[in-house]
Amino acid sequence: MIAFIGSVFSPWYRWSGRREPQNHCCINMVTTGTDGRFTMTDRGRSALRQSRDSFQVGPSKLTWTGKELVIDVDEWGALPKLGKLKGRVVLTPRAVTGVEVRLTPDAGHTWRPFAPIADVEVDLAPGHKWTGHGYFDANFGTRALEEDFSFWTWGRFPLKDRTVCFYDATRLDRTKVALAVQINPDGSVCEIDSPPPLVKMKRTPWFVRRETRCDAGAHPAGVYSLLEAPFYSRALMRTQIDGEETVGMHEALDLVRFRQPVLKPMLAVRVPRRAGWKHKD
């Protein structure tokens, strides 16, 4: 689940010249399986409501209670699986970090790992009710991703006594981001001085390149695909870190592909525009 102000993957926002981020907001929810849905409705300024502790876009809302992030979802799935997706997700951080990471030297892009270790309770219709572990982070940017990056990959992997995150990216000027951090249960964060090597993996069905960091000699592999696109992949990845086998979340984003104009009309099918919205109160 991702909440956007200035929806970076919205063709409508791109076609608008990225002038008004508040006029292109959405709450993107993806569920999988037989009853899986993909929701990414691009909504206008009238749908957006913000306060210190809440963020609402149209019928869906995020609320921070001081201890939990409560996400009330009321969305409509895009093609090819139309239909309502409604319910609640509650994320309870084990701890909240104070870390902010610059992904570009001028802080034009930053990453905030708010709660890399969290418990999640999901109750969504149709067909999704479970509890497990999760995470809560955010990216902030003053420019389009494709204006600064050609490729990036990110992974979060829970271990027995900590969680590790890897952020590897190539900027358009060919400089690199190579970030490896360890998050402890108390919320303390430290950079990993000698991160494991970066290993290439099998490409996706769309031939998106994938790589992650793991122990030397290990063979990371996708175990469950969550979202595949011509420029993007999200999957559960099995790998080995410090001798421990783990399954975590992995993303890969090819921004050279995303930059191609031909993709924008394709995205418009999956990202419908709904400019008008009236809150009942």
From Swiss-Prot:
Q: What Gene Ontology molecular-function terms does this entry list?
A: hydro-lyase activity
Q: Which CDD domains match?
A: CrtC-like
Family indicated by similarity: Belongs to the CrtC hydratase family.
EC numbers: 4.2.1.131
Q: Name the catalysed reactions.
A: rhodopin = all-trans-lycopene + H2O; 1,1'-dihydroxy-1,1',2,2'-tetrahydrolycopene = rhodopin + H2O
Query: Which example biological process does GO assign this protein?
Result: carotenoid metabolic process
Name of the protein this chain belongs to: Acyclic carotenoid 1,2-hydratase
Source taxon at top rank: Bacteria
Keywords from the named record = Carotenoid biosynthesis, Chlorophyll biosynthesis, Lyase, Photosynthesis
Q: What class of enzyme is it?
A: lyase
Does the keyword field hold Lyase? yes
Question: What is known about what this protein does?
Answer: Involved in the biosynthesis of carotenoids spheroidene and spirilloxanthin. Catalyzes the hydration of neurosporene to the corresponding hydroxylated carotenoids 1-HO-neurosporene and that of lycopene to 1-HO-lycopene. It exhibits negligible activity in converting HO-neurosporene, HO-lycopene, or any other derivative such as spheroidene, 1-HO-3,4-didehydrolycopene.
Biological pathway? Carotenoid biosynthesis; spheroidene biosynthesis
Q: Has keyword Metal-binding?
A: no
